[in-house]
């Protein structure tokens, strides 16, 4: 059975998709209005999310509870006219499954009890059977896809190898990546060994999410922007490119979005991948990004690189905009969409925030954002 036939057989398990606006935009097909969703759209800014999380007891218990993970995924779709759902989970599920002891401290974010600091730590990392150690994620994907009943497409996701490695080596979040960058410059082979293991796990993890029901995939390279130019190419992009290429072999019809926070400087580099779309944070104007990608595609084609004709863009409203008044939010959305369509394009764009929505946003302001996107005349 071909990969395409396999994907078709998977789709037969679920209700037909009713709103395919986002998928059409990613394929550069005509759309009636701009599709929109929000990173972290199921999260702490919603009172109903807080109530469900309190019932679960803690964050990871919520992630591992199929019914509650399904519930919080659906909550924003009951409030807002969103064009996609995204699996409720965490980017650190892979290192947690590798035995690093993930835990959360109030006000400090995720931490690991057993960070990777020496070769023995690295050698102990298991080769994951994602359908065993991360089966709760796959159960959630299937449950969510079934509950959506074809309303909108479902995103699956993973952290990038570089981003996962920073947490695993630092033992949590970091401002300076002291240990990770220390290995990068003093023992790069050690870091490459870790990134190689992680890339293999990310491929299998995202593959399993598609089999479970995910219709789109996003790779979150949240800390790729912390790297220098050459280091980004070698320690982040190379592994992201490998992941996307393998996913396209296994599931050629599944769109892949690659989001590198702080990666606007490297759009020309990221263009040399099989990703269908590139995510932008708020520091890069969308019209400029379109121009860079158009030129990059021209140069890559000139050098006989086998690529699709173009790449869609996703993003990129500053999440802090949602602290503003409704009038300010609408004005900023209109400016963002003016930029997105400035070069005459009428598709190939998905509206989103430039990073995740924060816990302090008024839920009513999120609705202003979403409605303003849909109200904009392309």
From Swiss-Prot:
GO terms for molecular function: uroporphyrinogen decarboxylase activity. Its main location: cytoplasm. The record marks 90 as: Transition state stabilizer. It is found in: Cytoplasm. Pathway: Porphyrin-containing compound metabolism; protoporphyrin-IX biosynthesis; coproporphyrinogen-III from 5-aminolevulinate: step 4/4. Pfam families: URO-D (PF01208). Gene3D superfamilies: 3.20.20.210. Its EC number is 4.1.1.37. GO terms for cellular component: cytosol. It comes from the Bacteria. Substrate binds at residues 40-44, 90, 167, 222, 355. PANTHER family: METHYLTETRAHYDROFOLATE:HOMOCYSTEINE METHYLTRANSFERASE RELATED, UROPORPHYRINOGEN DECARBOXYLASE. Homodimer. NCBIfam families: hemE. Catalyzes the decarboxylation of four acetate groups of uroporphyrinogen-III to yield coproporphyrinogen-III. This is Uroporphyrinogen decarboxylase. It comes from Psychrobacter cryohalolentis (strain ATCC BAA-1226 / DSM 17306 / VKM B-2378 / K5).
